[in-house]
């Protein structure tokens, strides 16, 4: 790896890969979470931590709720129970791909899935952990009203939402909080008349939220290097943009 663009497939932890500025950026006092939510099955439905994609896309055309859980100590996303990994992360969610996923899928047209969603976010996720919930394709309030007209809205109210309420039209939303800390809520819903809350008055959402941190280190992990019969040496060169203090 030599050219800066070659590094975009690396994995970053507590380091933000800024391709446009060609910089690795360290933000010592916060970690950025952002999410893109589209009113369709776009592969661009995705969320990121400090610029590193955690997971993306939707599994089918059935509107899901995607739930991401972020550990407040490591700022790493929980993974799903798959093939022996994360055996304690089975919350009644739907599994989509043949790998560990970094969000938990709950379909909005199933009463059983809605109940499993409520149990997960209220009872299985510890206080202090970060929750990102987004409705890719659409929030199916119509289904909520038919299947569980009280508990779904009460669940979001218990998490601190004041915008995910009865009477909303079916549109995507994004919701973020540190569980147990209602003052940390960041949420975005779309006004179908004015387009307020959407990206450029379209039906998509781009939302940013921040997680305060005192972490003083980060990591960058490259993709697999090779194959090769033998490696003799590895070299790393870095030019810091910060002033050098020799005092």
What do these predicted regions represent?
Residues 128, 171-173, 232:
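Structural beta-strand/beta-sheet cores of well-ordered domains, especially the beta-sheet scaffolds
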Residues 45-131, 136-138, 142-143:
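Conserved mixed alpha/beta catalytic, RNA-binding, or beta-rich assembly cores of soluble enzyme
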Residues 69, 134, 176-177, 236:
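Hydrophobic side chains in beta-strands
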Residues 139-211:
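Contiguous ligand/interfacial binding patches
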Residues 69, 119-126, 179-180, 220-230:
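Extracellular and analogous surface-interaction loops
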Residues 73, 138, 181, 228, ...:
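Short loop/turn segments at secondary-structure transitions that flank enzyme active sites
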Residues 1-38, 59-61, 200-247:
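Beta-strand-rich ligand- or partner-binding modules
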Residues 14-77, 182, 186-205:
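N-terminal, charge-rich interaction modules
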């Amino acid at each position: 790896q030599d050219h800066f663009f070659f590094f975009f497939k690396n994995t970053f932890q507590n380091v933000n890969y800024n391709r446009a500025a060609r910089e690795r950026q360290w933000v010592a006092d916060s970690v950025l979470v952002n999410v893109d939510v589209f009113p369709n099955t776009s592969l661009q439905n995705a969320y990121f931590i400090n610029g590193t994609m955690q997971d993306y896309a939707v599994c089918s055309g059935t509107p899901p709720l995607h739930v991401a859980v972020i550990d407040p100590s490591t700022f790493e996303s929980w993974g799903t129970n798959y093939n022996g990994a994360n055996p304690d992360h089975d919350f009644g969610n739907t599994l989509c791909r043949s790998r560990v996923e970094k969000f938990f899928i709950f379909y909005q047209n199933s009463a059983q899935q809605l109940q499993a969603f409520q149990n997960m976010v209220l009872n299985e996720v510890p206080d202090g952990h970060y929750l990102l919930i987004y409705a890719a394709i659409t929030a199916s309030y119509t289904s909520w009203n038919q299947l569980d007209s009280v508990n779904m809205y009460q669940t979001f109210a218990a998490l601190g939402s004041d915008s995910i309420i009865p009477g909303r039209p079916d549109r995507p939303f994004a919701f973020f909080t540190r569980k147990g800390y209602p003052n940390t809520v960041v949420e975005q819903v779309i006004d179908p008349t004015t387009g307020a809350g959407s990206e450029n008055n379209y039906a998509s959402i781009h939302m940013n939220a921040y997680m305060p941190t005192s972490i003083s280190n980060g990591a960058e992990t490259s993709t697999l290097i090779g194959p090769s019969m033998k490696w003799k040496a590895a070299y790393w060169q870095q030019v810091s943009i910060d002033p050098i203090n020799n005092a």
